[in-house]
Amino acid sequence: MAAVLNLQLKVDADLKAFLAAEGRPLHGKTGAILEQTLEAIFANIAIQGTSEQTEFLDVLVEVKSMEDQKVVGSFNLKEVVGLIKIFRTTSSDPNISSMTFRQVCEAFAPEARNGLVKLKYKGVFTNLFSTTPEVGGKYPELMFDFNKGLNMFIMNKAQQKVITNMNRRLLQTEFAKSENEAKMSSVTTDLCV
């Protein structure tokens, strides 16, 4: 197996175990309820994005049963994001502790996509889709910044194109930001002389 896949599987297993400790959002959850909770967690993270500057909402998110819409669990989004970041920084595995928040979330990209599919029917979309709907087209559930964890080989051509175009757009934005920062730095240096 590929090293990257092994690492993603380890992150998946270790983070699930970490979040299953007493008092945490996955405690006592199994089967469909566990999957729905993971979908809710990572879809909500995907909505806002995984930038280190993102301020996550301090809100209680309810997880409802697919069958009868009864509440089967809940979590505070800001607290769960904090727990995931603690998991990353305190991991004894140097491969995990050196990852970014975004890279940790990539292991849960399928759960994020599945949660976003459900939310699109309620009119809820990611910030990335809301700012560039022309890129997402019919697939808003693919417009999140840790979609690198999705398996492109099981997608149709249109879905692959959405991911490719979105990632290209993100790279262009990051490049433009770094250019502007470099220009601002040189202007500041000029002023100090």
Curated annotation (Swiss-Prot):
Q: Supply one GO CC term from the record.
A: helical viral capsid
Which superkingdom is the protein from? Viruses
InterPro entries the UniProt entry points to: Coat_protein_tricho/vitivirus (IPR008879)
Annotated localization: Virion
Mention any Pfam family matching this sequence.
Answer: Tricho_coat
Keywords, in A-Z order? Capsid protein, Helical capsid protein, Virion
**Official protein name in the record:** Capsid protein
Annotated source species: Apple chlorotic leaf spot virus (isolate apple)
